[in-house]
Design a protein with these regions (language model features):
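Bacterial N-terminal signal peptides
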Residues: 3-15
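Phosphate-group recognition and catalysis centered on beta-loop-alpha active-site segments
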Residues: 17-340
Length: 340
């Protein structure tokens, strides 16, 4: 870790990293430039940075020997060649209350993970890079961000998500302590640093709030669902109740922002017609919370008919509401709209 800490020092100087404010709205590269390259690879992150993204968004899971790596979930077969290389290691686990069969990060060492290569998750996207790129560790990502910040002369942020937090804690591999150690070793400890840490769960964010001054983000899913770590609670809590004025005030006691599904801001009916925007952004701002919405994608299959297949039209509508940031698979598109 000492090597990484020394290497990152130029990135952490006040004129590069410790900006007092962020651009508004932020363009957050969702799993990197994942619309063009396999998600959560150094190459996808680097492309997003080259395109001008303000932040890259690594999802974090952990290996058997406690190394943080970037994957959207702990089951590896959808985004790597693990099934071909480790066919006999298939197993079944209960993850966040669901039975899942596959190959899991917590069953592999970091050395074994390093032998895997990434592949495109979605069959309708370009498959040409399958098998070319490895699975990065969090330390790899921090080094990339440092290098590209120095090269480009601008701050580049990391927007981390802890995945399956309760699950990993219960199997003895809690994510939060190694996340904070890695960031601390990189000199990233202050609320002014270009770092956010997000989660769909609650208790881990409350714990993180006691561990760090870095900015925390409460993700918000489909309204009727309950955060996984709250499902056994005596208190009935749903994402919908968390979006009431009282719920937002409670979030503001431990987090700095919310990350809602974009349909919680501009809903649509079953035919895909847009309905009037909700007042979630206004009320979140009133509670002192930033609002970063997910997920924006270019493909027509992800756009409601009101946008006529034009992703720029979607961005314009959301930006006009005062949104503070977007998670996007195509950061270049969002940045082009901001430049209009």
């Amino acid at each position: 870790m000492a090597r990484i800490f020394i290497f990152l020092l130029p990135f952490l100087s006040a004129d590069v990293c410790l900006a007092k404010s962020f651009p508004m709205p932020l363009v957050i590269a969702h799993r990197g430039a994942s619309g063009l390259l396999p998600e959560h690879t150094l190459e996808a992150y680097a492309l997003a940075i080259e395109q001008g993204a303000h932040f890259i968004e690594p999802d974090l899971v952990i290996t058997r020997d406690g190394i943080l790596i970037a994957r959207h979930e702990n089951e590896l077969s959808d985004t790597t060649d693990v099934a071909e290389k480790f066919a006999s290691r298939v197993t079944t686990r209960m993850v966040d209350g669901k039975e899942v069969t596959g190959w899991f990060t917590e069953d592999f060492t970091a050395k074994e993970i390093a032998t895997l290569r990434a592949k495109e998750r979605l069959p309708f996207r370009n498959q040409a890079s399958n098998g070319k790129f490895r699975i990065p560790t969090l330390d790899d990502i921090l080094v990339l961000v440092q290098r590209e910040s120095v090269r480009s002369g601008r701050p580049i942020g990391v927007y981390l998500e802890t995945k399956h937090s309760t699950y990993f804690r219960d199997v003895g591999l809690a994510l939060e302590p190694p996340v904070i150690r890695a960031l601390t070793n990189a000199g990233l400890t202050q609320s002014t640093d270009w770092v956010f840490i997000q989660s769909f769960e609650i208790d881990n964010l409350r714990s993180l709030d006691t561990m760090t001054d870095l900015r925390l983000v409460q993700l918000l899913g489909v309204g009727h669902l309950t955060p996984y770590d709250q499902q056994d609670s005596d208190k009935v809590l749903t994402y919908e109740s968390m979006m009431t004025d009282g719920g937002l005030a409670e979030i503001a006691t431990y987090a700095d922002a919310i990350g809602p599904w974009k349909s919680l801001i501009i809903p649509q009916d079953r035919e895909g017609n847009l309905l009037p925007a909700t007042d979630l952004i206004f009320r979140a701002h009133r509670a002192g919370l930033l609002v970063h919405a997910y997920t924006f994608r270019n493909e027509p299959r992800y756009l409601v008919k009101a946008y006529n297949g034009d992703p720029a039209a979607e961005y314009r509508r959301f930006f006009a509401l005062g949104l503070d940031g977007v998670f996007t698979d195509f950061p270049a598109t969002a940045l082009a709209v901001l430049a209009e």
